[in-house]
């Protein structure tokens, strides 16, 4: 009966985010950069009935070599950022194996899951999910490809690259609630791939969510949420940026200070949205940890 209710909710749930996210309405950080100064280091604290999630496109380590934006120069800012933000779970996009290894070893208190998109092992970018072991227990997880053959490494429709989604089911220890988390990265070139990839993700959420658990979806969607590709997701989930009573209007893609596009989003179902935040702070003197800012949301478990 729960499963039937979950499927029916696709068609009857009200769309929570009707406002258009026109980039002209969004602003970059001060002088086109992140916040002034170095951030405080005291970890953020949330209530026992809340979950904090972060989505972060880390920018692949194979790009920007021999520049001031090279991975080896900016990676030092990432562990203190996560220590300060203190998320329950977080998803990363574009992470190569060396970046996954860095996060596993340097972000204390978290374990990470995910596979390389090129071979289902370690080759190519990983849509990784990390979880705070003191707060959540991993129940099960998997990866599927955004293509017509989702169970094998493959490229779908008009996509330029292989694209994957990593999903996991967690038990939240403080509240006892089980929830599902999906992290992905839609194609930057193929519009059909973005549309059909998101439809596939919706269908997989229904398939894998056997307990009708609350759901979180994070990604670099390479689209603003007024794009019609989101119509199917808006019938199932809520956009944290527009629904949370505490939010901001900063762009998430900074393009190393040259852009303010709003393409990184957090969607949820079965939670109450508390706050949304674009993380623009400076750590260890690194102005840009990536060409994307991390985005975070605090979600409250429904009674």
Mark where each language-model region is:
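Sec-dependent bacterial lipoprotein signal peptides
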Residues: 1-15
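Metal-dependent phosphoester-hydrolase catalytic domains
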Residues: 29, 37, 192, 196, ...
């Amino acid at each position: 009966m729960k499963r039937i209710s979950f499927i029916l909710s696709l068609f009857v749930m009200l769309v929570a985010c009707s406002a258009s996210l026109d980039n002209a309405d969004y602003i970059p950080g001060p002088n086109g950069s992140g916040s002034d100064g170095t951030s405080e280091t005291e970890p953020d604290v949330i209530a026992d009935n809340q979950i904090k999630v972060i989505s972060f496109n880390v920018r692949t380590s194979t790009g920007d070599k021999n520049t001031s934006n090279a991975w080896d120069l900016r990676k030092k800012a990432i562990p203190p950022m996560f220590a300060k933000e203190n998320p329950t779970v977080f998803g990363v996009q574009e992470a190569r194996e060396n970046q996954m290894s860095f996060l596993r070893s340097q972000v204390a208190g978290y374990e990470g899951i995910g596979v390389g998109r090129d071979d289902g092992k370690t080759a190519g970018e990983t849509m990784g999910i990390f979880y705070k072991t003191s707060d959540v227990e991993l129940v099960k997880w998997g990866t599927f490809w955004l293509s017509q053959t989702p169970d094998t490494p493959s490229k779908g429709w008009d996509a330029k690259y292989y694209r994957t989604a990593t999903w996991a089911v967690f038990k939240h220890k403080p509240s006892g609630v089980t929830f599902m988390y999906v992290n992905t990265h839609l194609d930057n070139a193929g519009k059909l791939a973005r549309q059909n990839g998101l439809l596939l993700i919706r269908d997989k959420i229904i398939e894998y969510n056997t307990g009708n658990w609350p759901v979180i979806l994070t990604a670099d969607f390479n689209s603003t949420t007024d794009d019609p590709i989101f119509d199917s997701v808006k019938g199932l989930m809520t956009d944290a940026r527009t629904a949370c009573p505490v939010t901001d209007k900063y762009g998430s893609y900074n393009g190393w200070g040259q852009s303010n596009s709003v393409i990184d989003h957090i969607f949820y179902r079965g939670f109450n949205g508390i706050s949304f935040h674009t993380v623009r702070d400076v750590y260890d003197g690194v102005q840009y940890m990536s060409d994307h800012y991390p985005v975070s949301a605090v979600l409250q478990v429904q009674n």
